Amino acid sequence: MVVGAFPIAKLLYLGVRQLSKPVANRIKAGARRSEFFKNYICLPPAQAYHWIEMRTKMRIMGFRGSTIKPLNEDAAAELGAELLGEAIIFVIGGGCMVLEYSRQAANSRRKEEELAQSITSLQTQLGELALTTETLDAQIREVNRLLLSLPAAPSSK
């Protein structure tokens, strides 16, 4: 019974993705507690996201030129923390995809190299067989020439 290779890399990637959610939640909680993190990491992307979202909604509804009020600090911090958490999960997922792609590319490259090596080996064997065939053909011609040059043996009855 042949047992296939255990896909340890895929299991590892799945584990990393599952661990990324609690890590993202802890980072979000830390972002809510830290003033520096809140003011410089969470608030600017949250306000930008809010501005873009509201501007898009206003344009879809047909309102032009209306001013958009910024979010209050607590709502912006919460939205920024959520955006940060989603970005972390997205980056980890993207990293897993890149690693899987590179692993698959390495496997494909290895298989192509093995195939090229096999083809080269077969070509070498074919060349050797052609040389052997030519040698045997020359020997057969030599034997035929010698047979034809022998005097005919008298038949005895």
Swiss-Prot record:
Presence of keyword RNA-binding: no
Location, primary (coarse class): mitochondrion
Entry superkingdom: Eukaryota
Cellular location(s): Mitochondrion
Stretches assigned to coiled coil: 103-129
Keyword set includes Plastid: no
UniProt cross-references to InterPro entries, sorted A to Z: OPA3-like
PANTHER family xrefs: OPTIC ATROPHY 3 PROTEIN, OPTIC ATROPHY 3 PROTEIN OPA3
Purpose: May play some role in mitochondrial processes.
Protein name as annotated: Optic atrophy 3 protein homolog
Source organism: Danio rerio
Lineage per the UniProt record: Eukaryota, Metazoa, Chordata, Craniata, Vertebrata
